[in-house]
Amino acid sequence: MDLTAVALLVSLVSVSLSAENAGGKARSCTDVRQFYSGKGFTLNGVPQSEISGEHLRICPQGYTCCTSAMEETLSNLSRREFEGLVREAGRSIQALLNAQYRTFDTYFLELLNGSERWLEEAFVAALGELYRLNAGVFRDLYAELHRYYSGASLNLEEALDEFWMKLLERLLKASDPETASLLSDDFLDCASKQTETLRPFGDAPRELKAKLVRAFIAARAFVQGLNAAGEIVRKVSQVPLSPECNRAIMKLVYCPHCRGLGSVKPCINYCKNVMKGCLANQADLDTEWQSLIETMLQVASSFGAEPSMDTVIYSIPVRISEAVLAMQENMEIYTSKVFKACGDRGEEGTPSSISEEPKKKERTVTALEYKPSPKSAARLEVQVTDVYSKLKEMQLYWIQLPSALCSGKTASSTTGDKCWNGITKASYLPEVMGDGLANQINNPEVEIDITKPDRTIRQQIMLLKIMSNRLKNALEGNDVDFQDTSDDFSGSGSGMCADHLCVRGRPPVFGPKTDRPKLYATGPENKRVKGSGNQIQPSFILLIVFFVSLLLRR
């Protein structure tokens, strides 16, 4: 059969489809007018009964109740609603991340502040005025710990070493206050260099550093991970819908109304294909997003492992008390060795009058001991369990988003041919596409140029990789410097409440017993998508094949 015959058949079928209502009386547009005014639009120019639809650019060109102006208005509305729902879905995830950030941050700072209070109370009771005169050394230590946890660019190991050096200097001067002013800077510098060999504080500095540095690295990495995840969700959720994808959303949502089928819900697989096409770039976040969440789950689990987080934080006063006690008990031996190594000369070369038999102090420090209470252990367990469950809920967010946005707005799978398939009320035959950009090459609803991924989303995928690697380093106890991404993750919690859009107390989008977001969300930026308004549907193809087979029999 020649091409002319095929073209003639296609034309005949098209005419028959567009004239399906020609034989009968034009239907009333009362329902469409009521729907349109319910959306807040004026009824000026809205037809009273169906008109020919050759003017339509998105919806099927059969008899319709929509003018060109109505189609454009509803198309713009579908875009706003879709983008709004994706942002709302993103805000619910941001709210979950923000809640976890606030809960953990509160818990951690309570531990740190409680540790500082305990040290001060114990040392004031033990040393009285001597502690008050030197309290700045201890306060400086805790201030540095706060700064490090908050993201300051400092080396925590060096900060701890600096603390021990200052403490050594103060204890040396306190051992004989009458001659303390005669100790030269050179002598004190020499004395500090002897600590590695003489170990005046015993094993306390080494034991504190080993556990404390690892715990703080993990805690800082964890809150930065929560912050980074929230910021990535915010940026991706704001990627605008492309014009071509807007056509597919309009066809899915409002074209049924123009056809007089406003009560007919979209076929579920039809909706999924539109969503998977429009959110293809977003779905490509899945691999790295899951990797980030999995690593954060490992970090969260480490907080409850021995030694637990609270034990490590409260070990600061314990180790300091052990160190001071060791120094007091061995002061005579230590000063003797220091004078032997560093000389006994004071400032400006004058002989030091420091006694080689330091005076024994009446007041001394007792070694502290921390025993976690059952209440403290239970709170930590609840903290870890809650973090674990909430992060698990959002692990599949990006690939669940298309189905979540279709949930509740589509016909059930048992309705068969009683759903909107993009053309009319009938069954939907195409298979559901896979997730991600590469799987949309044969999407019947949204044809995407898979060679042009969205730039903004690709940048966020790279940031997810960077963040995951940093968290993995933190698990190994390796220090993590977040300052080089301060432009992307600025300040604590910057990704959680952007533009005052924090959602307080909102249930999660995904996971058990949650309300799914309503229909339709945002499409990727700069991607080439072609609408499916002119595509030949399966039922149409079957009709053509039927006519062709008849001709071939001639």
Curated annotation (Swiss-Prot):
GO molecular function: fibroblast growth factor binding
Transmembrane segments: none
Disulphide connectivity of cysteines: 29-65, 59-255, 66-258, 190-342, 245-278, 267-419, 271-406
Lineage: Eukaryota, Metazoa, Chordata, Craniata, Vertebrata
Residues carrying covalently attached carbohydrate according to the record: 490, 492, 494
Keyword Lipoprotein: yes
Predominant place of localization: membrane
Protein name: Glypican-1
Signal peptide: 1-18
Gene Ontology BP annotations: cell migration; common bile duct development; intrahepatic bile duct development; negative regulation of fibroblast growth factor receptor signaling pathway; regulation of protein localization to membrane
Membrane topology, from the record: Lipid-anchor; GPI-anchor
Species this protein is from: Danio rerio
UniProt key word Cell wall biogenesis/degradation: no
